[in-house]
């Protein structure tokens, strides 16, 4: 929706929209750790389920009831105009080689990050970091995700998503090098911090790039396609990580 109805300030709008998720990734781990000291994990899950069932419908209705979906952000004639972009259909996108190249770039983050999150206990034990260290490191991950979100929104509006796309996975690549060559508990913060930077970039670029290249008329179906591939990549990544662990590979070998 944001990609469709924002043009000039799409990057800032997307970064604001993703701000809630990254903030929750910072707050919830701390909150859950505290709640575990006073109640069981079963009670926490029950409470979360009840809160979602009650507040999510109310909040969603309150936020969208006064929205006007017939309007779009106005752009001056002298500035770039999205109406000049050819509006691709999903079947046309599937025939475009650029889609697959971009997808390979975009899917690296969810593919690797999901494996890290699911098997964080294996990484923690292999590196002897300790559960409290990894929990604190996730706070660094969330903080840098938020900071990167806010910065990337302005950069996208200034330079476009296509120019920033090539930088998205550089921090992610550096994080694997950290995992391979360093064992100190301090490197846990660097490791997850670098993943957080790539995550912040990926969240915004994952929506704005498609709108810039393929237009917004069919952005829903195109985004659905890329999201389906993302879900598949996370499932495949998790399975591959598990298989390699069962085969006796070390975390350094997996990262390599």
Predicted regions and their residues:
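Helix-to-loop junctions at the C-terminal end of transmembrane segments
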Residues: 148-160, 245-246
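Helix-loop-helix hairpin linking two adjacent transmembrane segments in secondary transporters
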Residues: 21-68
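Cytoplasmic helix-loop-helix junction between adjacent transmembrane helices
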Residues: 1-19, 215
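Extracytoplasmic gate region of multi-pass secondary transporters
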Residues: 91-152
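Flexible cytoplasmic inter-helical loops of multi-pass small-molecule transporters
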Residues: 64-87
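Structural signature of the two symmetry-related core transmembrane helices
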Residues: 163-178
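A late C-terminal transmembrane helix in Major Facilitator Superfamily
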Residues: 25, 216-248
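Paired small-residue
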Residues: 186-194
């Amino acid at each position: 929706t944001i990609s469709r109805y924002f043009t000039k300030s799409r990057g800032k709008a997307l970064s604001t929209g993703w701000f809630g998720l990254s903030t929750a990734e910072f707050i919830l781990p701390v909150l859950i750790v505290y709640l575990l000291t006073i109640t069981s994990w079963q009670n926490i899950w029950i409470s979360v389920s009840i809160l979602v069932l009650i507040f999510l419908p109310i909040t969603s209705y309150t936020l969208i009831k006064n929205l006007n979906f017939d309007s779009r952000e106005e752009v001056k004639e002298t500035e770039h105009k999205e109406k000049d972009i050819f509006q691709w259909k999903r079947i046309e996108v599937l025939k475009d080689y650029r889609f697959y190249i971009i997808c390979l770039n975009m899917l690296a983050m969810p593919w690797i990050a999901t494996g890290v999150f699911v098997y964080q206990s294996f990484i923690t034990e292999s590196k002897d970091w300790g559960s409290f260290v990894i929990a604190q490191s996730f706070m660094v991950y969330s903080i840098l995700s938020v900071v990167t979100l806010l910065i990337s929104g302005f950069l996208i509006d200034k330079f476009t998503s296509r120019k920033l796309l090539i930088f998205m996975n550089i921090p992610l690549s550096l994080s694997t090098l950290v995992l391979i060559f360093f064992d100190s508990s301090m490197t846990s913060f660097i490791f997850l911090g670098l993943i957080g930077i790539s995550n912040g970039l990926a969240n915004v670029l994952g929506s704005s790039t498609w709108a810039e290249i393929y237009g917004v008329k069919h952005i829903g179906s195109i985004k659905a396609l890329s999201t389906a591939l993302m879900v598949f990549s996370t499932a495949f990544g998790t399975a591959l990580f598990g298989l390699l662990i069962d085969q006796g590979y070390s975390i350094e070998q997996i990262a390599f």
